[in-house]
Amino acid sequence: MLKNTGHEEISLSSLSSSDYSQLEELVNFLIDNFKDKGVNISLPSLRIDAFSLDVMGKVQDIKKSSLTFAPEAGSQRLRDVINKGLTKEVILEGAGMAFEGGWNKVKLYFMLGLPTETEEDMKAIPELANEIAALYYDTVPKEQRNGKCQITISTSFFVPKPFTPFQWATMLDPSDYLARAKIVNDHVKEQLNHKSCLLYTSPSPRD
């Protein structure tokens, strides 16, 4: 299929790719078969605590790209509310592993409008991203850095889904979502410094 389409990337796009017990074996198989063809292996939306440095290193050997992690909430309080099961320490440890593996571009996925979300929770998103950016310079020696660190913050808007703990939660109006995205964007600008590069991308609430 790759030969016929000309595609240059194979993406394991499941939301729980890192929970797959045979992930390392699958990555090894893909690398063995496509490394010489210059085909990139993409592992999006990974759980930081379940990500293997060994797997990262093998993927990095093919082609440098960005990694996507999904903390989903910026504050520990809100991560506990949604039962994410991630502490800031684990997030920073996972990001440090990625930087040690040769990455300098990381995409962080969050949700806005989660039940009980406050302005402090929103501001915690760019603050966490900035801590991760600072970690890059603390973790990787200057002579080993692969360019400037780039952290991309991506948010989507919470939509209640049936048969989930928050199925009866209220969905916000589009104007409320835009107001929350503005809070995040404004606070991102306050985090910028000469070393790190924080980018923020937010979809339209009508997407």
Regions found by a protein language model. Give the residues of each.
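A structural signal for short, well-ordered beta-strand segments and their strand-loop junctions
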Residues: 152-154, 198-199
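Short, active-site-adjacent cap segments at secondary-structure transitions
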Residues: 19, 160-161
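Conserved SAM/AdoMet-binding glycine-rich loop
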Residues: 2-152
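Conserved small/polar residues in nucleotide/adenosyl-binding loops
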Residues: 200-207
